């Protein structure tokens, strides 16, 4: 009779003790070597970028992802050249144009004699 009760308990499998044992078997406390061997090797960031997934979005730097000259853009608008103060390409040349109209250029021999 005692054997019948034990058999019925093991067949049902509803013991909390059995449930804990199966959960512990499924979740190892330390990573096993078989898990490391079965996992695919991590992709190199350049490979992730070429496919377009992963931590790297693309090969383009993030400063180019927003429109130029936008409110929080890292890049100035395309018309702003160096030394123009954001006024355009011709703004930096106004001094040189004024010298040309006055006849004083840096490569002119007259500029040195006047």
From Swiss-Prot:
Record field: compositional bias (Basic and acidic residues): 1-28, 104-114
The keyword Phosphoprotein is assigned to this record: yes
Keyword Phosphoprotein: yes
Disordered: annotated span: 1-48, 83-114
Post-translational modification: Phosphorylated by host ERK. The phosphorylation triggers a structural change that enhances keratin binding and protein stability.
GO cellular component: host cell cytoplasm; host cell nucleus
GO biological processes: symbiont-mediated arrest of host cell cycle during G2/M transition
Compositionally skewed regions (Low complexity) per UniProt: 29-38
Keywords from the named record: Early protein, Host cytoplasm, Host G2/M cell cycle arrest by virus, Host nucleus, Host-virus interaction, Modulation of host cell cycle by virus, Phosphoprotein
Compartments, record wording: Host cytoplasm; Host nucleus
Note from the entry: The major E4 form is first synthesized as an E1^E4 fusion protein from spliced E1^E4 transcripts, such that the first few amino acids of the E4 protein are derived from the N terminus of E1.
Subunit structure: Assembles into oligomeric complexes. Interacts with host CDK1. Interacts with host SRPK1; this interaction may favor expression of late viral transcripts. Interacts with host cytokeratin components KRT8 and KRT18.
Family to which this protein belongs: Belongs to the papillomaviridae E4 protein family.
Function, as annotated: Contributes to multiple aspects of the viral life cycle including viral genome amplification, suppression of suprabasal cell differentiation and egress of newly formed virions. Induces host cell cycle arrest at the G2 phase by associating with and preventing the nuclear entry of host CDK1/cyclin B1 complexes. Inhibits cellular DNA replication by preventing loading of host replication licensing proteins MCM2 and MCM7 onto chromatin. Within the cytoplasm, associates with host kinase SRPK1, a splicing factor regulator, and inhibits its activity.
Protein name, per record: Protein E4
Species lineage: Viruses, Monodnaviria, Shotokuvirae, Cossaviricota, Papovaviricetes
């Amino acid at each position: 009779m005692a054997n019948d009760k034990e058999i019925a308990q093991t067949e049902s499998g509803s013991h909390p003790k059995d449930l804990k044992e199966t959960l512990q078997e499924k979740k190892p406390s330390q990573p096993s070597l078989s898990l490391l061997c079965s996992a695919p090797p991590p992709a190199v960031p350049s490979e992730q970028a070429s496919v377009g997934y992963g931590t790297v979005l693309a090969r383009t730097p993030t400063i180019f992802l927003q429109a130029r000259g936008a409110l929080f853009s890292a890049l100035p608008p395309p018309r702003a050249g160096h030394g123009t103060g954001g006024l355009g390409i011709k703004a930096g040349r106004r001094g040189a144009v004024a010298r040309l109209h006055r006849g004083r250029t840096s490569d002119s021999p007259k500029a040195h004699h006047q």
